[in-house]
Amino acid sequence: MSEDGSTLARRQLGKYLRDGREGCDLTLAQAAMLIERSGSTLQRIEKSTVAHLRDVDLDALCKIYSFDADHTAAMKGLAVQGNELSWWYEFGDVMPTNFDFFVGLEASAQRLTTYEPELVPGLLQTPAYASVLIRSVYPDDGPEEHARRVQLRIRRQTRITRKHQPATLNVILRESVLRGMIGGSKVMATQMRHLADMSTRSNVRLQILPFGAGFPLGVAVGPFVILEFGADRQGQAIEPPVVYTETFTGNLYLAKPTTIQRYHDAYESLRQNAMDPADNRALLRRMAKEYA
């Protein structure tokens, strides 16, 4: 079982259970009542945000939805995979509320397409840069707790840096990301060099949207990530793509196909106005020298 497979298994199981419920023309409340659980609990099961699905609940749902023996066996197989604890659960004590779901999606994704207008994305941050940002959010953390938060962020980066089947990362950073001082000139110099080095990886495409490009979409665009999960042997998507957006007060997951396409179109417009990868590296290395 791969470190990221448990999240996909939970998502697939949730989808099949939702399809089964809708096929029986049952509401969440009606199906939940039949298994003596709350509607919110069943909704979390269908949305794959329950870390451990009880066998008794799965057995009851399979019977209610009239799944045959093969279908039920497949559901139980997915449940076993989904119940396996992934690496990030050891960081549960320092994991922001509900962020484990995003980390699971990120660890499962085959391709991540992201735009950041203000900060270096977590997957490309150096430990020092991450430490400054995390300290700002959690100023009361003790040394050990703070170190674990930084460790969690850096651990996520192995999805991009590992040798075996690393995910593809497409990133556009607005020039303001390079100009905004985080932690002082030494931290910024190291971060600029790290970005330049990461951009040489075959699975990473990093581009800078210069100030001179203005606002290609006519409006200011907030940060977003498009997560895609690859295809099976028949060329069918293993899981539908998801867009994740984050704001000061919370986050949002978007899955409607037309919405996903709008974000792809937005990214393409930004990409067409961004610098070429080779020019990006030259700029990043020049800025590293300036900060140093």
Where is each model-derived feature located?
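Short alpha-helix boundary/capping motifs
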Residues: 2-3, 49-50, 59-61, 70, ...
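Short acidic/polar alpha-helix capping motifs at helix-coil junctions
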Residues: 5-6, 22-26, 39, 97, ...
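Short secondary-structure junction/hinge motifs that connect adjacent elements
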Residues: 33-35, 93-95, 282-286
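Short, functionally important structural connectors and interaction interfaces within domains
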Residues: 37, 45, 97, 104-107, ...
